[in-house]
From Swiss-Prot:
The lineage of its organism: Bacteria, Pseudomonadati, Pseudomonadota, Gammaproteobacteria, Enterobacterales. Gene3D superfamilies: Peptide methionine sulphoxide reductase MsrA. GO terms for cellular component: cytoplasm. This is Peptide methionine sulfoxide reductase MsrA. GO terms for molecular function: L-methionine-(S)-S-oxide reductase activity; peptide-methionine (S)-S-oxide reductase activity.
Amino acid sequence: MSLFDKKHLVTQADALPGRNTPMPIATLHAVNEHSMTNVPAGMEIAYFAMGCFWGVERLFWQLPGVYSTAAGYAGGYTPNPTYREVCSGQTGHAEAVRIVYDPAVIRYEQLLQTFWENHDPTQGMQQGNDHGTQYRSAIYPLTPEQNAAAHASRERFQSAMAAAGDHRPITTEIAHATPFYYAEDEHQQYLHKNPYGYCGIGGIGVCLPPDA
């Protein structure tokens, strides 16, 4: 597939077939030793895509109230894809992060603030120097409340950009969450295991105005 083709989402009919077996990952989070799969009572899940998932995962695991994070693939068609398959542009997935958080400590709105303020949501099928559909900006809400908050935050951030003199349209995809597939274990908490590894995310200098 050419670089040009990788800038256009594959159709479900043309996506790779994938496999039934999930990627094996460590049982515990490498940073905080919490479960990588379980969701404790009272906690909630959020999914965000904002470029290379190595830096994105670190961004969120550092937030108070976040119980665990995981790198993976979302928004596509191919079941249990490999990293190489996702990078081919033939699965439809974005590199995404699964966040398990305690809403009594950190609100979904605060996660949205971290999302908007730490990447460029105007770049379409790329993020910085990373090109391809897997690097697109996306929010995958799980509930009507998350969906409403995501759309409202996009409107506020677009207005804040305009007020700052930036009139580029936001290209962030907001779509109901489809299955999330864990990435290979080598990608989990990558920047903890490789402190000098690549991190290509960065904001545009605009802050998300608070919700009403």
